[in-house]
Amino acid sequence: MFPMVTEFMNYGQQTIRAARYIGQGFMITLSHANRLPVTIQYPYEKLITSERFRGRIHFEFDKCIACEVCVRVCPIDLPVVDWKLETDIRKKRLLNYSIDFGICIFCGHCVEYCPTNCLSMTEEYELSTYDRHELNYNQIALGRLPMSIIDDYTIRTILNLPEIKT
């Protein structure tokens, strides 16, 4: 008779323990219910990128002196710089500048080490295409200024600032 009573006690303790675990899980679920949503509806809502965001590279053709520092500091030797030496003034003249964003790792070394600041990072990150050859941008495509997300009236922008708890 005693083994039956102890088994019944163990069953009761296990039932209480299981109910407590379920209650703890339910309390965690309820604590998450009053939080703001983490996800956004992407094509219609966009997050405002941070100031140091490394997006598409913007290139200013007139500032470039064809020194090829960007090619030397690039970990994958990506920028293609074509230039011609002008013998009468003994300076390089830039003919063509291109970057293939299908290969670029967006490290920002080219922007950081450029002596004339002709390269800069933009907030543009939508570079997807159906053909990978379209990701090879020449100096004309690199010189195009991106449309700011804030200026686009069709998109609702969401400021992503972390909450500071005090």
Swiss-Prot record:
One of its GO terms (molecular function) is quinone binding. The keyword Plastid applies. Its cofactor is [4Fe-4S] cluster. It is a peripheral membrane protein. It holds the Pfam family Fer4_9. Binds 2 [4Fe-4S] clusters per subunit. The keyword Phosphoprotein does not apply. SUPFAM superfamilies: 4Fe-4S ferredoxins. [4Fe-4S] cluster 1 binds at residues 64, 67, 70, 114. InterPro entries: 4Fe4S_Fe-S-bd, 4Fe4S_Fe_S_CS, NADH_quinone_OxRdtase_chainI, NDHI. Its EC number is 7.1.1.-. It is found in: Plastid, Chloroplast thylakoid membrane. Gene3D superfamilies: 3.30.70.3270. [4Fe-4S] cluster 2 binds at residues 74, 104, 107, 110. Keywords: 4Fe-4S, Chloroplast, Iron, Iron-sulfur, Membrane, Metal-binding, NAD, NADP, Plastid, Plastoquinone, Quinone, Repeat, Thylakoid, Translocase. One of its GO terms (biological process) is photosynthesis, light reaction. GO terms for cellular component: chloroplast thylakoid membrane. NDH shuttles electrons from NAD(P)H:plastoquinone, via FMN and iron-sulfur (Fe-S) centers, to quinones in the photosynthetic chain and possibly in a chloroplast respiratory chain. The immediate electron acceptor for the enzyme in this species is believed to be plastoquinone. Couples the redox reaction to proton translocation, and thus conserves the redox energy in a proton gradient. Belongs to the complex I 23 kDa subunit family. NDH is composed of at least 16 different subunits, 5 of which are encoded in the nucleus. This is NAD(P)H-quinone oxidoreductase subunit I, chloroplastic. It comes from Perymeniopsis ovalifolia.
